[in-house]
A protein has these predicted regions:
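Conserved catalytic motifs of ABC-family nucleotide-binding domains
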Residues: 117
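H-loop/switch region of ABC-family ATPase nucleotide-binding domains
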Residues: 156-158
Length: 171
């Protein structure tokens, strides 16, 4: 719920206080404006989007953030990130999350995190339902995000498994 409220999900209403991000009051901003400002939410149950490829989704989101992206550079970085997550290249051409296992959906979310490099990443139970190997790979992707980018992470979890693998300031 916290992640959805921070991202401005329409089904939740803030009844008091403010949501400040980078010194700006975003309490009444739309979800897309929050995303453009640098916020990212990894869903506990990622949606399936038939007809929109994983690659197309990430490239479109990246272009919304930074403008034109050279296709060669994009493909090279996408391949690098997918390799870190041990995702077969064919996943890039598949419809977003359609037919993906739970672990594959989580990897796709972390792939988005690695490619979009948001200022604030809210990971909502990213490790939920994952086996030890999948948690290790997801954690590796989160570590890569931290290494490559000076962004903040808000990790919402019922387990400490992912926390054991990432660098953190406050727990």
């Amino acid at each position: 719920t916290l992640g959805y409220v921070l991202m401005g999900a329409p089904k939740y209403t803030v009844t008091g206080g403010q949501i400040l991000f980078k010194g700006e009051d975003i309490t009444h901003e739309s979800t897309d404006k929050r995303a453009k400002a640098g916020m990212f939410l990894s869903f506990q149950e990622p949606l399936e989007v038939p007809g929109l490829t994983l690659e197309g989704f990430i490239r479109s989101a990246l272009q919304q953030k930074v403008g034109h992206v050279r296709y060669y550079d994009f493909k090279k970085e996408l391949a690098r990130c997918m390799d870190i997550l041990q995702m077969d290249a064919s996943y890039a051409e598949r419809s977003l999350n359609v037919g993906f296992s739970g672990g594959e959906k989580k990897k796709a979310e972390i792939l988005q995190l690695m490619m979009l490099k948001p200022s604030l990443a809210i990971l909502d139970e990213t490790d939920s339902g994952l086996d030890v190997d999948a948690v290790r790979l997801v954690s590796k992707g989160v570590e890569e995000y931290q290494k490559d980018h000076n962004g903040a992470l808000l990790i919402i979890t019922h387990s400490t498994r992912i926390l054991d693998a990432v660098s953190y300031t406050h727990l």
